[in-house]
Design a protein with these regions (language model features):
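Acidic, metal-coordinating catalytic segment for phosphate/diphosphate chemistry
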Residues: 1-22
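A generic structural micro-feature
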Residues: 13-17, 91-98, 115
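Short, well-ordered beta-strand micro-motif
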Residues: 25, 101-105, 123
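Conserved Nudix-box catalytic region and its N-terminal flanking loop in Nudix hydrolases
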Residues: 26-66
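Nudix hydrolase/Nudix homology domain
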Residues: 40-41, 109-152
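A short coil-to-beta-strand element that immediately follows conserved catalytic motifs
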Residues: 70-80
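Active-site-adjacent beta-strand/loop module that shapes the phosphate/pyrophosphate-binding cleft
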Residues: 80-110
Length: 152
């Protein structure tokens, strides 16, 4: 059981503050997205920091858990937080996220859904994106405005 799941048992649906890592996998100018099972919207692979873990470790772990992929290196792109990273899950859980956005480099492995958090994994061009979860939309807008070099 994750640390956040344990906290949820104590605080119920009240807002929690969570640090986590989100991982950009970009291949041939396309971004890897996951169709989330909890919201049925597309997001960027990632998740919450566990006790004793550094954010880079979170990025490596979440990439493997959610996509089946490995990366040789994670490069920190930016840290994002604030009102745009407040999220209410369909079950009513409220969360303020502090997101460390990483770029996965030298990615290997075979795409596969391994954890039940994703319904589908797919690469999309930045100019033809599906229905995005709000935090993913904010991160992609940030990339388009501040790090066009990542898009290709």
């Amino acid at each position: 059981m994750s640390y956040l799941s344990e906290l949820r048992k104590i605080v119920g649906h009240r807002p929690l503050l969570s640090a986590g890592a989100t991982v950009l996998v970009i291949k041939d100018g396309k971004i890897l997205l996951n169709l989330r099972s909890d919201t049925e919207t597309w997001g960027i692979p990632g998740g919450g920091l566990e006790l004793g873990e550094c954010l880079e470790e979170t990025a490596f772990r979440e990439l493997k858990e959610e996509t089946g992929l490995n990366a040789e290196k994670m490069t920190l792109v930016t840290v994002l937080s604030g009102k745009d990273f407040y999220f209410v899950y369909p079950n009513g859980d409220m969360l303020y996220s502090v997101v460390s956005l990483y770029l996965a480099e030298n990615v290997s492995g075979e795409l596969k859904i391994t954890d039940g958090e994703s319904l589908k994994l797919q690469y999309f061009s930045f100019d033809n994106l599906p229905n995005l979860e709000s935090r993913a939309k904010t991160m992609i807008e940030w990339i388009k405005e501040n790090r066009k070099d990542l898009i290709g």
